[in-house]
Every structure is written in C-alpha cells, then in structure tokens.
C-alpha cells in the first residue's frame, strides 16, 4: 500500500490539465504511441469539440521512480469549469493529494482558487505545478509569487514543466511520489468502497468507479450497496489504463471499476458505499453533499411520440451526471416534457447536446429560471422554479430572489469595465483586494443575472482575462414580476419569464420585437403583447397580408370596389376571431437569447 498514490489534477479552464495527463500516461507507458491521441481522457465527442473536460476520468499507471521502486499512480483528470465543480469535489474525495496546475503565462485565476480551497478543506496535499513554461509569455517567477500571495501555499520550489513538449514531466512524477502521502486504510477490515462515479453501459449494465478505503474486493465476491441494501455478485472488476482492463481484484487504497450486473439505473448511486454481503462494515462512508440545481428550464420533445424515449434518456444521463434533476411537466403550448434543474447555463447546453446526440432526440427548451422563495399572505413559504407555478399577485406577501456571491479575479486595466457590468447586473460590491497586478473583486449579484449571460459578458468586457467563481449565498427580498407574452389575447405559457420590475419594460419590449420578426405573417393582424398581471406594457403587431381584390375592376362605378373591399373586411374579421397562430420553434429559442445583442 505504501507504493500507491492517489491524486487529481485541478486547474482553471485551459491551463493544460488534460494535456498534462496525456504526458503522464505517455511517460508511464499506459498506451502505445500508436493509440496515443491528444486529450485521451476526454472521451465524449462533445468534450473534444469544445476542448473542455466535462466528466472526471480516472487512470491507473505504474511508474518506476528514481528510488528503484515501482509506484501505482491512480489519477483523476477533473473539469475546470465552474458549472462542473461538483465533479471536482467528488474526485477529490477519492484522493490524498492534488496537482494544482497553473499556466505560467496567465497566472492564478478564480477557478484555480475555488478548486484549491476545496482541496484544502478536504485536507489534501496540494502540489503546485507551473505549466506552459515553453511559451514566450511565461513568467514562472511572477506566477510562483502570485500562488504564494493569493492561494497561500509554498511555491518557490514548484515544478516547472511544459505538458505540450514533455519538458519536466518526469520531475512532476517525482514530486507526486515524494510529496503526496500514501493512502491510509486497513486491508483486513471489512470492505468499504466509495462509488465516485457511475455510468450505464448497454451490455454490462451499471459500471461504477470505486475507491477502496478499507478491505479489498475480488471477483465473484458478494457485495451489498449500503443505501439500498441490495446484494450483488461482482461479475467483472478492473482498472483503467485509459483502456478498461480486467483484473482479479482491487486492494486497499486502489481505484478501479466494478460491474455487478445491476440493471436498475438507481441501483448504485454516486457517493454510496459498497461492503461485503456477510460481515460487512457497520457504517457507510461520508458521501458527497448533494448539489442543488441553480437553473431550471423546461425541456420538451418536438414530437410527442418521443416522450418515453426522452424519459429513458434522462434516466440514463442522471446516473452519469449526479447533479441533473428532472420532474414531469406539461405545457399547453408544448405538450408533455420535463422540468430539469442544472448547475448553470453551460451545464444546460451540454445536457441538451448530449440528449440530442447520444439519444437522437429533438428538443425545445423554455427560458431558464432560478428558484425563487415566496412568502404568501397566510404566512407559508413556497419555492418555485417555473413562471407558471407563480401564485396570483394578490396572494404574495413578498418575493425573495437568490443572491450569488461572485469572486472575480482580473488584471487591473479591465477593472472599470467589469465594475460597470456588475452594477448593470444589480450587483453590490462587498470586497476588493489587490495582489500585484491582479485584483480580486467580490460581488453579490442576483443569481438570475449570473446564470443568464454574465459569464459571456464578463469574458468579452475583459478580453478573456477575468475569471469567475460563484456560489449561492442567500435569498433576499426583491420586486420580481411575471412577464406574460400574449398572442392575439391568448397567453403562451412557455414564453412567460420572471424578471425584476425595473427590467420588465425593457425585457417586454425586446421579447415583443423579437417575436414580431419571427412569427410569420398571416391573412389577419396578429397582436403580440407583453403584460404584467392585467397591465399591458409593450405591444407590436404583425401586419396582415392582403390580397388585392380590386385588381380586376377597371374604371366603372366606385360602389363595385366598395362592395369587394367590404366583403374582404368581413372575411378578415371572421378569420381574426377564428384564426389560430402557430408559434414557430425559433421563437422559443429566441427568448433564451433576448438581451444578448
């Protein structure tokens, strides 16, 4: 056991985690040079296309150290995006140490900090690594000082390497062996294995990634899932050397995968403990804290026949992605679908793309909302996550919206722009600290403003240099209203949005204008209105197409023309009272992007 090292790699987006893991795999000979490709661990097409890591991946490598011993390194590559921080905390729970990778050109960024603090709270050994030192813009000395100044860990002797060229990677491996402690555990105690991740394989059933804390696990053992009490036999067991390799068993302190023939998707929840069926462990390991979704949106299949397969797809996806929440919902405009909860807008986009690709579905999304707390006149408190669930205005005593605490790290020269942006988003500054050339700003901004497009706007005002980390702080009383969109006097429930009273007029006008462009012209006028309660705050009209009925008259009496025009008028009137307007697909999507341009 003393030759095992478990660690994860944490870093900000694009600081080179996945490339460094490629080099580690190559140096330790995990894959032959023929099988090697860039970002081996980003196994989803989506990850490769966007160049981001979404799922944490684990690998077991054997490394011959300079002291002559062979060490077993189990490492987990983690995502850097703020929406996927729960993946990071899960990975860290299975480790004794973490490599903190910092780009020697960019320096410390907000996500580096957030993930690093998570690691320190879990009492892991944090080993700083300065990456990308082959770049002309690299300033390892300045960045090392920055790490000491902002993060507060000793970084004078931080390893300098370039994951791209492979320079200094052997030093990184030596540091891992020297500084990260070996796992602690009792090989003879009853089995306790923590499920770090699970996914569904259509041939094998549920495959779980586990970290053995105490005891050991062998093929054909009978094991019990502690939360459900169900007993399963271990069919296959093994490790990833990125490829799935079968072994006879896993010892104490090791990380590997287990297949028990579980067909039920909720049979092995993430964060659960496995133990032996006979003489098992008394109590389960401390799992992970459940993450609460921050953004809710309705997802509806375009054709109602897809509803069943859509539900299966969500079931399978939620096994792999523990933070996805969903419940059935129906809408008069869109039929049956699900209300889904996500951690942020990126998470929502990724889930939607995964559903469309991996499960071949066509979906419509409604405008995302956050969770509001409402105190009613009778003194009870409710939480709502969709505009249609909002009670009538006269029953509401007060409405509270969620406030997020945002930590923003940025170079000084962009400070003006970023502060202006935060004020525009109704933010309140609570702290500001200078670290050399960097400024750390802390703002309290309403969650609804943060999740919508704050991240994109922040990146564009600071030319990509500012970085953001946010978390839910509290609920605060605020004047929120429900903005309804009416088409020819009928409310379209899927287009309703909850917004702040100050922005309501502006949002209403924007949505109405956007709708006017997108709804095709009919033979009669279509009135598009935005209303709050019974008060109309914006209106625009899609003008009717009309046929020139008098074209066939030439000269002659004017009463003939009048007769034809009046006949047309009658027809239009009847059409208007009977006509129905179909809202096209683009109109629902346009709501998501209102106010971006």
UniProtKB/Swiss-Prot annotation:
One of its GO terms (biological process) is positive regulation of translation. It catalyses: GTP + H2O = GDP + phosphate + H(+). Residues 2-184 form the tr-type G domain. GTP binds at residues 14-19, 131-134. It comes from the Bacteria. Keywords: Cell inner membrane, Cell membrane, GTP-binding, Hydrolase, Membrane, Nucleotide-binding, Protein biosynthesis. GO terms for molecular function: GTP binding; GTPase activity; guanosine tetraphosphate binding; ribosome binding; translation elongation factor activity. GO terms for cellular component: plasma membrane. It is found in: Cell inner membrane. The keyword Cell membrane applies. It is a peripheral membrane protein. Required for accurate and efficient protein synthesis under certain stress conditions. May act as a fidelity factor of the translation reaction, by catalyzing a one-codon backward translocation of tRNAs on improperly translocated ribosomes. Back-translocation proceeds from a post-translocation (POST) complex to a pre-translocation (PRE) complex, thus giving elongation factor G a second chance to translocate the tRNAs correctly. Binds to ribosomes in a GTP-dependent manner. This is Elongation factor 4. It comes from Aeromonas salmonicida (strain A449). The lineage of its organism: Bacteria, Pseudomonadati, Pseudomonadota, Gammaproteobacteria, Aeromonadales. The gene is lepA.
């Amino acid at each position: 056991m003393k030759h095992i090292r478990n660690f994860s790699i944490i870093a900000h987006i694009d600081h080179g985690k996945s490339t460094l893991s490629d080099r580690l795999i190559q140096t330790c000979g995990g894959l032959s040079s023929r099988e090697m490709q860039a970002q081996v661990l980003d196994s989803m097409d989506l990850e490769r296309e966007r160049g981001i890591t979404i799922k944490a991946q684990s690998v077991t490598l054997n490394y011959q150290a300079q002291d002559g011993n062979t060490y077993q390194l189990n490492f987990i590559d983690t995502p850097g995006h703020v929406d996927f921080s729960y993946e990071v905390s899960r990975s860290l729970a299975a480790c004794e140490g973490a490599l903190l990778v910092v780009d020697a050109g960019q320096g410390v960024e907000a996500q580096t900090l957030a993930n690093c603090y998570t690691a320190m709270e879990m009492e892991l050994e944090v080993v700083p690594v300065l990456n990308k030192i082959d770049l002309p813009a690299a300033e390892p000395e300045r960045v090392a000082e920055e790490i000491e100044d902002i993060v507060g860990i000793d970084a004078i002797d931080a390893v300098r390497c370039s994951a791209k060229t492979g320079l200094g990677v052997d030093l990184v491996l030596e540091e891992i062996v020297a500084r990260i402690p070996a796992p602690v555990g009792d090989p003879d105690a009853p089995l306790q294995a923590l499920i770090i991740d699970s996914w569904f394989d259509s041939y094998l059933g549920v495959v779980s990634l586990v970290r053995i804390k105490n005891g050991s696990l062998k093929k054909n053992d009978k094991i019990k899932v502690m939360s459900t009490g169900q007993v399963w036999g271990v069919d296959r067991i093994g490790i990833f050397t990125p490829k799935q390799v079968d072994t006879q068993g896993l010892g104490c302190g090791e990380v590997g995968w287990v297949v028990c023939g579980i067909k039920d998707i909720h049979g092995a929840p993430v964060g659960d403990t496995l133990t032996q069926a006979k003489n098992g462990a008394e109590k389960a390991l401390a799992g992970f804290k459940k993450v609460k979704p921050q953004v809710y949106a309705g997802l509806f299949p375009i054709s109602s026949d897809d509803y069943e397969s859509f539900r299966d797809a969500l079931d399978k996806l939620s096994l792999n992605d523990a933070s996805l929440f969903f419940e059935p919902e129906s809408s008069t405009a869109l039929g049956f679908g699900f209300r889904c909860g996500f951690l942020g807008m990126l998470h929502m986009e990724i889930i939607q793309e995964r559903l469309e690709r991996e499960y071949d579905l066509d979906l419509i999304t409604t405008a995302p909302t956050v969770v509001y707390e409402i105190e009613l006149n009778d003194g009870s408190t409710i939480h709502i996550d969709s505009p249609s669930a909002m009670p009538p205005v006269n029953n509401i005593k007060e409405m509270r919206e969620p406030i997020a605490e945002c930590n923003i790290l940025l170079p000084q020269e962009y400070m003006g722009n970023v502060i202006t942006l935060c004020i525009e988003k109704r933010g309140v500054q609570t702290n500001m600290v200078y670290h050399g050339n960097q400024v750390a700003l802390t703002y309290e901004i309403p969650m609804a403003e943060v999740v919508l497009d704050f991240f994109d706007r922040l990146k564009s005002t600071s030319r990509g240099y500012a970085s953001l980390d946010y978390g839910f702080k509290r609920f605060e009383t605020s004047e929120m209203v429900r903005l309804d969109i009416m088409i020819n006097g009928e409310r379209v429930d899927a287009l309703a949005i909850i917004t702040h009273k100050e922005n309501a007029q502006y949002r209403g006008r924007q949505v109405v204008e956007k709708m006017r462009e997108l709804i095709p012209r009919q033979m009669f006028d279509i009135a598009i209105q935005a209303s709050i309660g019974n008060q109309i705050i914006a209106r625009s009209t899609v003008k009717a197409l009309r046929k020139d009925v008098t074209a066939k008259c030439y000269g002659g009496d004017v009463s003939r023309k009048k007769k034809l025009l009046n006949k047309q008028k009658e027809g239009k009137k009847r059409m208007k009272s009977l006509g129905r307007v179909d809202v096209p697909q683009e109109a629902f999507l346009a709501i998501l992007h209102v106010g971006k341009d």
